[in-house]
Amino acid sequence: CTLFAPYEGEESFEELNTNEDVQKYFKKIFPDLVPLIPDLCEQFFSNPTSSMAIMRTYPWHVDDKSILIGDAAHATVPFYGQGMNAGFEDCRILDELLDKHNNNFKTCFKEYSQVRKPNGDGVQDLSMHNFIVMRDKTADIKFLLQKKIEQKFAQQYPEKWVPLYSMVSFSNIPYSEAWQVGMKQEKMMQSIMNISNINETWDSEEIMEKMLGLI
């Protein structure tokens, strides 16, 4: 498993210096995990603590001389599992642009920077959003109910609702577009979740009709 925690402050890596510190921390934060890892302290201190970062830069090219691709252009945190895919997509788009512009590097590289920058930002936004979801919401009853409603609506009206995860992972929809659509969906779902008796009526056609009316 991987531990994500701040470097400094309360309950941070800087406080985990001895076996006693580690045992105390894990018993407090992850009590059900401790019995499953008898060599917890040994594993903790034998694995390096490393940082995660998001890097945003522009432009991604220098005339017709060089371009940035993948992590060199849009390094991101790993919480959507899309870093390598985004890099491969850079390559696909670059290849398409080389064909489009008959290998005119200067024109191609300029357009590459313009069209890929929003999607580099998009995959970073998606990654940070998913971190918050995994950290705060996966055990939240209301959030889980929201996902049930979304799933039912997507099954009934697949042409009107594609879940954000599906847009990102199983289509060629640009990251920036998926992010924008996902945020519109989230805003719509907040209206649905604010219905006073949603816990009782979530599985009804009435709710499905209300969602249709919001699209």
Identify the residue ranges that each predicted region occupies.
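Conserved FAD/dinucleotide-binding core of flavoprotein oxidoreductases
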Residues: 1-54, 101-103
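C-terminal helical "tail/cap" subdomain of flavin- and related membrane-associated enzymes
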Residues: 96-215
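Hydrophobic/aromatic residues within well-ordered alpha-helical segments
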Residues: 22, 26, 90, 116-119
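A short alpha/beta connector and helix-capping loop motif
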Residues: 80-97
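Active-site flanking residues adjacent to catalytic metal/cofactor-binding acidic residues
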Residues: 69-71, 89
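Glycine-rich phosphate/pyrophosphate-binding beta-alpha loops
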Residues: 51-57, 73-85, 118
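FAD-binding beta-loop-beta segment adjacent to the flavin cofactor pocket
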Residues: 50-68, 121, 139, 143
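A short, flexible beta-alpha/helix-coil linker loop
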Residues: 6-10, 74-75, 130
